[in-house]
Amino acid sequence: MVKYFLGQSVLRSSWDQVFAAFWQRYPNPYSKHVLTEDIVHREVTPDQKLLSRRLLTKTNRMPRWAERLFPANVAHSVYILEDSIVDPQNQTMTTFTWNINHARLMVVEERCVYCVNSDNSGWTEIRREAWVSSSLFGVSRAVQEFGLARFKSNVTKTMKGFEYILAKLQGEAPSKTLVETAKEAKEKAKETALAATEKAKDLANKAATKQQQRQLV
């Protein structure tokens, strides 16, 4: 039994912009689970299509019940191969990704097609499919459920990361993360408190000076 996912997303940027952002996605505030990316092969075909293969390393925190099934020294990083085919003439990009380790625990295969949105030529549509499978006897269903939930969570991060990079490339101010916003608010609160303290000291000093002047009179 294989868990299947089908989803569709829209980025409000042109295909050319999304294509450029695709190769510059990392790092971004939403991709902290992506540790490394390396291009291992690239070529242009006679019909002017760009073929690429990348190797990505991502963190892979297992659920506690899964950690009991594997030795403590099992790597918590996942190596992922990504093949992509870019057709600039038809403005399509197709990617295939799959993990090459931890395959006994779980295999996640993904296929994405990036194309011009049919309703708005200035937008880009992403059609995403994924297959989650496990060969672990007795717990394969639980592993697949976990894998599908993790995949959906990562899709959300991927889209937010895309939007962040697109905003930077287009010269807009990217939306700040909650951590950044909280940090700025904390710093601003400190500055406000410090300013209030200094003002209170100043007022106290002035009041003391006036009191002394009255006593002298």
Swiss-Prot record:
Stretches assigned to the PRELI/MSF1 domain: 36-174
InterPro entries referenced in this protein's UniProt entry, alphabetically: PRELI/MSF1_dom, Slowmo/Ups
Keyword Transport: yes
A molecular function GO annotation: phosphatidic acid transfer activity
Gene Ontology CC terms: mitochondrial intermembrane space; mitochondrion; nucleoplasm; protein-containing complex
Entries under PROSITE patterns matching the protein: PRELI_MSF1
Organism: Mus musculus (Mouse)
UniProt keyword Transport present: yes
Keywords: Apoptosis, Lipid transport, Mitochondrion, Transit peptide, Transport
Quaternary structure, from the entry: Forms a complex with TRIAP1 in the mitochondrion intermembrane space. Interacts with OPA1 and AIFM1.
Pfam families: PRELI
GO BP annotations listed: apoptotic process; negative regulation of apoptotic process; negative regulation of mitochondrial membrane potential; negative regulation of release of cytochrome c from mitochondria; positive regulation of cellular respiration; positive regulation of endopeptidase activity; positive regulation of phospholipid transport; positive regulation of T cell apoptotic process
Coiled coil: none
Location of this chain's protein in the cell: Mitochondrion; Mitochondrion intermembrane space
Record function comment: Involved in the modulation of the mitochondrial apoptotic pathway by ensuring the accumulation of cardiolipin (CL) in mitochondrial membranes. In vitro, the TRIAP1:PRELID1 complex mediates the transfer of phosphatidic acid (PA) between liposomes and probably functions as a PA transporter across the mitochondrion intermembrane space to provide PA for CL synthesis in the inner membrane. Regulates the mitochondrial apoptotic pathway in primary Th cells. Regulates Th cell differentiation by down-regulating STAT6 thereby reducing IL-4-induced Th2 cell number.
Protein's UniProt name: PRELI domain-containing protein 1, mitochondrial
Expression sites (tissue/organ): Abundantly expressed in all tissues tested except testis with highest levels in thymus.
Catalytic activity: a 1,2-diacyl-sn-glycero-3-phosphate(in) = a 1,2-diacyl-sn-glycero-3-phosphate(out)
